[in-house]
């Protein structure tokens, strides 16, 4: 379905949306279900239709509530029975500059304009606070685009009487609010309108005829932007960028042209283009995107190219380098296996359309953008929205380092015939704590990013995690794993609710980076010990199958839980007699 990839095929998206929806549902029979409330300052029917399509593309089936035309503020402040009963998971406020009244005139004093600005901001801030108090869910708010006319020409942007100046100042207030409030996100239509072309974006025909805030053809771009935020919130981002080398990271073929013959660096325009792309990839690494190489090349030539004196990327910027003559789809599958990531975690970037087609056909789930001209590589990846950032943790900032440490562990394992001896050699320490304030952001992030080792796929906000931590009936544990190669950070989370002498486990997940290290044993030993100390006699666990978590289908059976229920969808319930549990005593020191 190339219509979803940049550049968007808006004609297909708008005209064939029902067919596309059927095809997307058939392709993903077990989507994540979410309720999205759209509070609009304009007509939003097409916005909801397009947003639904893009979310389905990311494996999220949305149910929508839409306010009546221009009733966004009234619905938020005074409520409606329909919205109250809807219980949204996400609220999207779709407003634009036409919802700003009044706007400055040349007759207004600067003091009056400042008061007007404060009043407009208070109008929105009061609404956001009311929604937070009532629904406690993420809120996505458009910033403001600008009119496609300027009353005073260039003066409009710097004169306080100008609409452009007023909107710019109001946007800054919105950004300050976003910076200081969790679960509040800006959908940047100021950028989208500039990228699309402000004259076409703000075509007044669509406002006066249909009360659409933007032109019809721009709505898919708007919906894609909102969908990128939502899929990021629910762990549907891509995690890794796999790059070809020749004519992708540099101009030329290193095996034929030699390192000196490659176009990279400041000497020629072509080299500048590739250097800029390498800089972009390096910047992606800095926000937690892991980089890998998949190239048909001799490894020595590939490494020589990556060590080019004018290059930006170096071999240690990559967590895996597959430079050989194997099919690229097999290399990509090998990288996925080594990193314990699903294929749908990857973006594959290659200048060769034949190689792209093979990978797209042979590795379902991988994103394969159409790279057309090196000068467009950055734009294509950026507009794809693969790596939308809604939260940035310390673990994200050192993601490449963590994977390099895992590679060192794999090398160390090869020296041992006995796996237990290998685990002992790692000198592991598991620090198992409650949901302490220091860890709240990372815990919430894990609930929204972990898909494979995740028994219930319960997605939680930071406020949800705080509520669990503050409830005396909740058992809340998170685990940090450290060994001689480094600190893995918080890698596992467990939460259960005690009712009498039973503990019901509603959340159990672990990062796949620490699979087969015994961390799950350490957590289970601790859960059972803590439960026993609370007077719990029975622990109840749940497994809810998804397209990605089959690996933990029999997780509880490994710890002598008995399966007590299973429904037609494969949802299972398991129980453990606490008194009968035998501790696993994993190969690590446990700190509490």
Residue spans of the language-model regions?
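A conserved beta-strand-loop-helix scaffold within acyl/acetyltransferase catalytic domains
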Residues: 431-511
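Basic, amphipathic juxtamembrane/active-site segments
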Residues: 254-279, 364-371
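Terminal substrate-recognition subdomain of acyl/acetyltransferases
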Residues: 338, 360, 364-426, 529-592
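Flexible inter-domain linker/hinge segments
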Residues: 3-22, 193-240, 374, 378-429, ...
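Acyl-donor binding region in acyl/amide transferases
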Residues: 484, 490-565
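Conserved Lys-Pro-Asp/Glu-containing loop-to-beta segment of HAD-superfamily phosphomonoesterases
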Residues: 332-353, 359
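Substrate-recognition element of Asp-dependent hydrolases with the DxDx(T/V) motif
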Residues: 272, 276-307, 321, 359, ...
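Extracellular glycan-modifying ectodomains
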Residues: 1-242, 249-250, 255-261, 354, ...
């Amino acid at each position: 379905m190339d219509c979803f990839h940049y550049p968007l095929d808006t004609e297909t998206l708008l005209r064939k949306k029902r067919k596309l929806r059927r095809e997307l549902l058939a392709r993903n029979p077990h989507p994540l279900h979410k309720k999205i409330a759209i509070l609009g300052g304009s007509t939003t029917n097409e916005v909801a239709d397009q947003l639904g399509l893009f979310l389905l593309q990311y494996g999220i089936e949305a149910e929508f509530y839409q306010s009546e035309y221009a009733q966004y503020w009234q619905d938020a402040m005074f409520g409606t029975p329909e919205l109250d009963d809807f219980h949204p998971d996400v609220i999207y406020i779709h407003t634009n500059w036409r919802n700003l009244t009044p706007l400055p005139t040349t007759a207004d004093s600067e003091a009056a304009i400042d008061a007007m600005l404060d009043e407009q901001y208070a109008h929105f801030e009061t609404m956001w606070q009311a929604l937070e108090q009532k629904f406690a869910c993420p809120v996505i708010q458009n910033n403001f685009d600008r009119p496609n006319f300027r009353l005073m020409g260039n003066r409009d942007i710097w004169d306080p009487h100008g609409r452009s100046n007023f909107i710019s100042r109001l946007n800054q207030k919105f950004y300050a609010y976003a910076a200081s409030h969790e679960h509040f996100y800006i959908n940047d239509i100021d950028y989208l309108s500039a990228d699309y072309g402000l004259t076409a974006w703000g075509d007044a025909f669509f406002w006066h005829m249909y009360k659409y805030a933007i032109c019809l053809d721009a709505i898919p771009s708007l919906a894609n932007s909102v969908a990128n935020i939502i899929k990021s919130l629910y762990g549907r981002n891509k995690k890794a960028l796999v790059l070809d080398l020749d004519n992708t990271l540099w101009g030329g073929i290193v095996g034929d042209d030699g390192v000196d013959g490659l176009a990279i660096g400041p000497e020629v325009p072509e080299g500048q283009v590739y250097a800029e792309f390498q800089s972009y990839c390096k910047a992606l690494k800095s926000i937690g995107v892991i980089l890998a190489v998949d190239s048909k090349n001799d490894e020595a030539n590939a490494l020589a190219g990556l060590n080019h004196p004018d290059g930006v990327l170096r071999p240690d910027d990559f967590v895996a380098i597959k430079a050989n003559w194997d099919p690229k789809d097999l290399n990509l599958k090998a990288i996925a296996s080594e990193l314990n990531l699903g294929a749908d975690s990857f973006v594959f970037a290659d200048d060769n359309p034949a190689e792209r087609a093979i990978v797209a056909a042979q590795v379902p789930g991988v994103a394969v953008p159409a790279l057309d001209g090196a000068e467009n590589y950055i734009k294509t990846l950026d507009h794809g929205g693969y790596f939308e950032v809604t939260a940035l943790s310390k673990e994200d900032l050192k993601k490449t380092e963590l994977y390099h440490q895992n590679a060192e562990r794999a090398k160390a394992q090869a020296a041992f015939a006995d796996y237990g001896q290998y685990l002992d050699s790692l000198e592991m320490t598991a620090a198992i704590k409650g949901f302490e304030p220091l860890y709240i952001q990372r815990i919430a992030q894990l609930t929204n990013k972990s898909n494979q080792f995740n028994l219930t796929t319960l997605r939680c906000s930071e406020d949800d995690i705080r509520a669990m931590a503050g409830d005396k009936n909740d058992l809340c544990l998170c685990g940090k794993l450290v060994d001689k190669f480094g600190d893995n950070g918080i890698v596992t989370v467990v939460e259960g609710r005690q009712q009498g002498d039973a503990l019901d486990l509603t959340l159990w997940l672990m990062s796949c980076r620490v699979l087969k290290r015994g961390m799950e044993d350490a957590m289970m030993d601790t859960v059972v010990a803590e439960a026993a100390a609370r007077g719990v006699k029975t622990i109840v666990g749940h497994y809810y199958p998804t397209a990605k978590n089959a690996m933990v289908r029999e997780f509880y059976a490994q710890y002598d839980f008995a399966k007590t229920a299973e429904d037609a969808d494969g949802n299972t319930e398991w129980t453990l007699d606490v008194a009968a549990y035998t501790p696993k005593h994993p190969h690590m020191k446990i700190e509490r």
